[in-house]
């Protein structure tokens, strides 16, 4: 799709995974930035970590109202805006070939093709999102995250920032106040919806 966007003259792409939840304002906000590559941060499902990787030696990240722009080592593509200039720079610098022209379909430039890199006396097989980031950094581009964006990652429930910073408290028993007032919306279980 990135190759097709370049061929058709689009100025940017916005990659959004089907399991992301966000306010529409997040789209305009990520498009507003001048940096060629900007990601939104979101939690891994079931883990206390973000899907993107921060530049070492990042020790602290402010999110939401206290957030801003910060550089990443690797960006997950669940909410990622890439400007045309970034694709062109990566293709030229990394000498990426135009593939599959012989089939008569839209050709493919392998921006996201998985790659293996050396890592701490071993090897690391990168998925397509981290491979794109690796190629971008090798091409001299910086990858940024807008840490003000509030994104939710759908899984067993909607994972948010809180899942990265805190353990969800699980309990053996729970008492929930139920409402008998039919005029107030409920969650469908009879339990009150939080204000």
Predicted regions mapped to residue ranges:
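Conserved catalytic core of nucleotide-sugar-dependent glycosyltransferases
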Residues: 2, 23-115
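Short, conserved alpha-helix that lines the donor NDP-sugar binding/gating region
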Residues: 1-7, 134
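Short beta-strand-to-loop acidic/aromatic patch adjacent to the donor-nucleotide binding site
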Residues: 9-21
């Amino acid at each position: 799709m990135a190759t097709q966007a370049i061929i058709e003259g689009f100025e940017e792409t916005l990659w959004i995974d089907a399991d992301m939840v966000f306010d529409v304002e997040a789209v305009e906000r990520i498009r507003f930035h001048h940096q060629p590559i900007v990601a939104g941060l979101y939690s891994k499902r079931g883990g206390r970590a973000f899907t993107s990787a921060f530049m070492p030696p990042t020790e602290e990240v402010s999110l939401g109202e206290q957030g801003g722009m910060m550089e990443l080592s690797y960006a997950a593509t669940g909410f990622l805006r890439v400007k045309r200039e970034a694709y062109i720079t990566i293709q030229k610098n990394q000498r990426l070939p135009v593939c599959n022209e012989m089939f008569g379909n839209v050709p493919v430039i392998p921006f996201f093709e998985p790659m293996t890199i050396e890592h701490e006396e071993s090897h690391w097989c990168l998925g397509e999102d981290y491979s794109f980031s690796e190629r971008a950094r090798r091409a001299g581009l910086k990858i940024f995250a807008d840490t003000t964006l509030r994104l939710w990652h759908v899984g067993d429930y909607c994972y948010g920032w809180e899942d990265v910073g805190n353990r969800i408290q699980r309990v053996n028993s729970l008492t929930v106040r139920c409402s008998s007032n039919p005029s107030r919306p409920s969650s469908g279980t009879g339990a009150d919806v939080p204000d």
